[in-house]
Each structure stands twice: as structure tokens, then as C-alpha cells.
Design a protein with these regions (language model features):
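Extended beta-strand/beta-hairpin segments
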Residues: 1-56, 63-146
Length: 146
């Protein structure tokens, strides 16, 4: 059965002077995160952005995909540390998410650096958020701490 997760954004005012509030409706884990255009395209000043939320989704989804793959192979990780950096840029005059750079380090007993890199790449390609971002260049840096 398909799972549906819902977030809501309420925006007031013009795009340049107004602002929005983003809430996780399904889980309720965050409410009223501030978003504005000036902080989206400049200094964050305590506000989030759609791109930061995409980065959070990508990092968390990828860590689950990598953990699942390693566990299926009989080598569950002791720990994984994943970050995703999403780039928002102008392409042909249109604002566009252009890249998501994943960086992962992990401690996985019994796994060589080459095996870790292979598992990391497999997870990058199989992660549902990676697949959702199919039009975005996704790169990966992996480091085995074992």
C-alpha cells in the first residue's frame, strides 16, 4: 500500500516582501518553519528553504537506503553520517535545483572501503528521493571509517 506524507505551506504577501510557514502535517514533527525569498536566495538568517528541505529529505532517505542495503548484505552499519547539499541556481532564466551532493561516512564492521563505496553507490541509485530527483545531477562522496 502506498504511503502518503503531507506538508503544508501558507504564504502571505508578495514573493519579494512576504513569507511563508511550512508545517509537517502528517507527522507534526515541525510547524511553522519560516521561508522567504530573500533568505532562500541569500543568507538563511534562521529560515529554511525548499532546497534545505529537499536536502534533509535526500540525506535521511539515502541513509535509510544505505543502511538497508548493508543490512541485507549481512553487515549492518554501526553508524552512518550523511549530508546532502542542494544547489539552487538560475538555468536558462529559470530558478532550478541543479545538484544534490551526498557525502557519507560510515563505520561498518567487516566491510572494506571498496565494498562500502559500492554499497554507497547502489544506495544512491536506489534511494526513492534520488529517483524523485532524476533530472538533478546527484554526486556522491563516501568514506569508510572501519
Amino acid at each position: 500500500m502506498a504511503e502518503v506524507r503531507t506538508a503544508r505551506s501558507v504564504w502571505t504577501g508578495s514573493v519579494t516582501e512576504g513569507g511563508g510557514k511550512v508545517t509537517a502535517v502528517t507527522s507534526g514533527t515541525f510547524t511553522d518553519l519560516d521561508v522567504t525569498l530573500p533568505t532562500r536566495s541569500g543568507a538563511a538568517e534562521g529560515n529554511t528553504s525548499p532546497e534545505e528541505l529537499i536536502a534533509a529529505a535526500h540525506a535521511s532517505c539515502y541513509s535509510m537506503a544505505l543502511s538497508a542495503g548493508l543490512t541485507r548484505a549481512g553487515t549492518p552499519p554501526d553508524s552512518l553520517d550523511v549530508s546532502a547539499s542542494v544547489t539552487f541556481d538560475m538555468v536558462d532564466g529559470a530558478p532550478t535545483v541543479t545538484t544534490s551532493v551526498l557525502s557519507v561516512s560510515g563505520s561498518v564492521p567487516g566491510v572494506t572501503a571498496d565494498q562500502f563505496a559500492e554499497a554507497a553507490e547502489t544506495a544512491k541509485n536506489g534511494c526513492p528521493i534520488s529517483r524523485a530527483l532524476a533530472g538533478v545531477e546527484i554526486s556522491l562522496e563516501s568514506v569508510s571509517l572501519a
